[in-house]
Swiss-Prot record:
Main location: other
Keyword Transferase assigned: no
Identification of the protein by name: Complexin-3
Topological relation to the membrane, as annotated: Lipid-anchor
Disordered, as annotated region: 13-47, 74-99
Subcellular location: Synapse; Cell membrane
Modified residues (Cysteine methyl ester): C155
Prosegment location in residue numbers: 156-158
Naturally occurring in which organism (per UniProt): Homo sapiens
Presence of the UniProt keyword Membrane in the record: yes
Processing and modification events after translation: Farnesylation mediates presynaptic targeting.
GO BP of this protein: insulin secretion; modulation of chemical synaptic transmission; regulation of neurotransmitter secretion; regulation of synaptic vesicle fusion to presynaptic active zone membrane; synaptic vesicle exocytosis; visual perception
Function: Complexin that regulates SNARE protein complex-mediated synaptic vesicle fusion. Required for the maintenance of synaptic ultrastructure in the adult retina. Positively regulates synaptic transmission through synaptic vesicle availability and exocytosis of neurotransmitters at photoreceptor ribbon synapses in the retina. Suppresses tonic photoreceptor activity and baseline 'noise' by suppression of Ca(2+) vesicle tonic release and the facilitation of evoked synchronous and asynchronous Ca(2+) vesicle release.
Length: 158
Protein backbone atom coordinates (compact mmCIF):
# COMPACT_ATOMS: atom_id res chain seq x y z
CA UNK A 1 0.00 0.00 0.00
CA UNK A 2 2.79 2.40 0.93
CA UNK A 3 4.48 1.63 -2.38
CA UNK A 4 1.41 2.65 -4.37
CA UNK A 5 1.02 5.89 -2.42
CA UNK A 6 4.70 6.68 -2.90
CA UNK A 7 4.57 6.07 -6.65
CA UNK A 8 1.40 8.07 -7.15
CA UNK A 9 2.33 11.04 -4.94
CA UNK A 10 6.09 10.86 -5.55
CA UNK A 11 5.76 11.29 -9.29
CA UNK A 12 3.49 14.29 -8.88
CA UNK A 13 5.83 15.88 -6.32
CA UNK A 14 8.79 15.49 -8.67
CA UNK A 15 6.86 17.19 -11.44
CA UNK A 16 5.86 20.02 -9.11
CA UNK A 17 9.35 20.62 -7.70
CA UNK A 18 10.91 20.30 -11.16
CA UNK A 19 8.79 23.09 -12.53
CA UNK A 20 9.46 25.32 -9.48
CA UNK A 21 13.23 24.82 -9.65
CA UNK A 22 13.42 26.72 -12.89
CA UNK A 23 16.89 26.65 -14.44
CA UNK A 24 18.31 23.42 -13.03
CA UNK A 25 20.83 21.79 -15.34
CA UNK A 26 20.28 18.05 -15.69
CA UNK A 27 23.78 17.28 -17.01
CA UNK A 28 24.63 15.05 -19.94
CA UNK A 29 22.37 12.22 -21.20
CA UNK A 30 24.56 9.35 -19.96
CA UNK A 31 24.40 10.55 -16.37
CA UNK A 32 20.63 10.87 -16.41
CA UNK A 33 20.32 7.46 -18.08
CA UNK A 34 22.59 5.94 -15.43
CA UNK A 35 20.59 7.56 -12.67
CA UNK A 36 17.37 6.34 -14.26
CA UNK A 37 18.77 2.81 -14.15
CA UNK A 38 19.72 3.27 -10.51
CA UNK A 39 23.47 2.94 -11.15
CA UNK A 40 26.48 5.13 -10.78
CA UNK A 41 28.18 6.44 -13.89
CA UNK A 42 31.01 3.89 -13.67
CA UNK A 43 28.56 1.01 -13.26
CA UNK A 44 26.58 2.26 -16.22
CA UNK A 45 29.69 2.49 -18.42
CA UNK A 46 30.70 -1.03 -17.40
CA UNK A 47 27.20 -2.23 -18.19
CA UNK A 48 27.36 -0.62 -21.64
CA UNK A 49 30.76 -2.24 -22.33
CA UNK A 50 29.35 -5.59 -21.30
CA UNK A 51 26.40 -5.14 -23.65
CA UNK A 52 28.72 -4.30 -26.54
CA UNK A 53 30.90 -7.36 -25.82
CA UNK A 54 27.85 -9.64 -25.69
CA UNK A 55 26.59 -8.23 -28.98
CA UNK A 56 29.98 -8.80 -30.62
CA UNK A 57 29.99 -12.37 -29.31
CA UNK A 58 26.50 -13.04 -30.68
CA UNK A 59 27.47 -11.54 -34.03
CA UNK A 60 30.57 -13.75 -34.21
CA UNK A 61 28.52 -16.87 -33.47
CA UNK A 62 25.93 -15.85 -36.06
CA UNK A 63 28.65 -15.29 -38.66
CA UNK A 64 30.13 -18.69 -37.85
CA UNK A 65 26.76 -20.42 -38.29
CA UNK A 66 26.19 -18.62 -41.58
CA UNK A 67 29.62 -19.74 -42.78
CA UNK A 68 28.90 -23.34 -41.78
CA UNK A 69 25.67 -23.28 -43.77
CA UNK A 70 27.47 -21.73 -46.73
CA UNK A 71 30.11 -24.47 -46.53
CA UNK A 72 27.41 -27.10 -46.60
CA UNK A 73 25.74 -25.49 -49.61
CA UNK A 74 29.04 -25.20 -51.46
CA UNK A 75 29.77 -28.86 -50.68
CA UNK A 76 26.49 -29.90 -52.28
CA UNK A 77 27.12 -27.59 -55.23
CA UNK A 78 30.47 -29.30 -55.80
CA UNK A 79 28.94 -32.73 -55.35
CA UNK A 80 26.15 -32.18 -57.84
CA UNK A 81 28.26 -29.99 -60.16
CA UNK A 82 26.10 -26.91 -59.75
CA UNK A 83 27.39 -23.36 -60.33
CA UNK A 84 29.12 -21.71 -57.40
CA UNK A 85 27.51 -18.88 -55.45
CA UNK A 86 29.55 -15.77 -54.66
CA UNK A 87 27.58 -14.93 -51.51
CA UNK A 88 28.43 -18.31 -49.98
CA UNK A 89 32.11 -17.80 -50.72
CA UNK A 90 32.05 -14.32 -49.19
CA UNK A 91 30.33 -15.64 -46.04
CA UNK A 92 33.01 -18.29 -45.67
CA UNK A 93 35.75 -15.67 -46.07
CA UNK A 94 34.10 -13.39 -43.50
CA UNK A 95 34.24 -16.20 -40.94
CA UNK A 96 37.94 -16.68 -41.40
CA UNK A 97 38.27 -18.85 -44.47
CA UNK A 98 38.59 -22.47 -43.35
CA UNK A 99 35.24 -23.38 -41.79
CA UNK A 100 34.58 -26.90 -40.58
CA UNK A 101 31.14 -28.40 -40.56
CA UNK A 102 29.61 -29.39 -37.25
CA UNK A 103 29.94 -33.09 -36.49
CA UNK A 104 26.23 -33.70 -36.92
CA UNK A 105 26.18 -32.18 -40.41
CA UNK A 106 29.34 -34.02 -41.43
CA UNK A 107 27.77 -37.27 -40.23
CA UNK A 108 24.64 -36.58 -42.28
CA UNK A 109 26.74 -35.95 -45.39
CA UNK A 110 28.65 -39.20 -44.87
CA UNK A 111 25.38 -41.13 -44.54
CA UNK A 112 24.03 -39.56 -47.73
CA UNK A 113 27.24 -40.40 -49.57
CA UNK A 114 27.13 -44.02 -48.39
CA UNK A 115 23.49 -44.36 -49.46
CA UNK A 116 24.24 -42.94 -52.90
CA UNK A 117 27.25 -45.22 -53.37
CA UNK A 118 25.12 -48.20 -52.37
CA UNK A 119 22.42 -47.23 -54.85
CA UNK A 120 25.03 -46.74 -57.57
CA UNK A 121 26.28 -50.33 -57.26
CA UNK A 122 24.79 -53.21 -59.28
CA UNK A 123 23.36 -54.89 -56.19
CA UNK A 124 21.85 -51.61 -55.11
CA UNK A 125 20.10 -51.30 -58.47
CA UNK A 126 18.87 -54.90 -58.27
CA UNK A 127 17.57 -54.40 -54.75
CA UNK A 128 15.56 -51.39 -55.87
CA UNK A 129 13.65 -53.43 -58.49
CA UNK A 130 10.14 -54.33 -57.32
CA UNK A 131 9.24 -58.01 -57.09
CA UNK A 132 12.84 -59.22 -57.09
CA UNK A 133 13.97 -61.49 -54.30
CA UNK A 134 17.75 -61.47 -53.98
CA UNK A 135 17.74 -64.57 -51.77
CA UNK A 136 16.02 -66.73 -54.37
CA UNK A 137 18.23 -65.28 -57.10
CA UNK A 138 21.32 -66.22 -55.10
CA UNK A 139 20.02 -69.76 -54.53
CA UNK A 140 19.33 -70.21 -58.26
CA UNK A 141 22.81 -68.96 -59.15
CA UNK A 142 24.45 -71.38 -56.70
CA UNK A 143 22.35 -74.28 -58.01
CA UNK A 144 23.35 -73.43 -61.57
CA UNK A 145 27.04 -73.37 -60.61
CA UNK A 146 26.64 -76.75 -58.92
CA UNK A 147 25.04 -78.21 -62.07
CA UNK A 148 27.86 -76.83 -64.21
CA UNK A 149 30.48 -78.43 -61.97
CA UNK A 150 28.73 -81.82 -62.17
CA UNK A 151 28.43 -81.67 -65.94
CA UNK A 152 32.09 -80.64 -66.20
CA UNK A 153 33.12 -83.71 -64.18
CA UNK A 154 31.15 -86.01 -66.48
CA UNK A 155 32.66 -84.50 -69.61
CA UNK A 156 35.48 -86.63 -71.05
CA UNK A 157 37.07 -83.81 -73.04
CA UNK A 158 37.84 -81.80 -69.99
Amino acid sequence: MAFMVKTMVGGQLKNLTGSLGGGEDKGDGDKSAAEAQGMSREEYEEYQKQLVEEKMERDAQFTQRKAERATLRSHFRDKYRLPKNETDESQIQMAGGDVELPRELAKMIEEDTEEEEEKASVLGQLASLPGLNLGSLKDKAQATLGDLKQSAEKCHVM
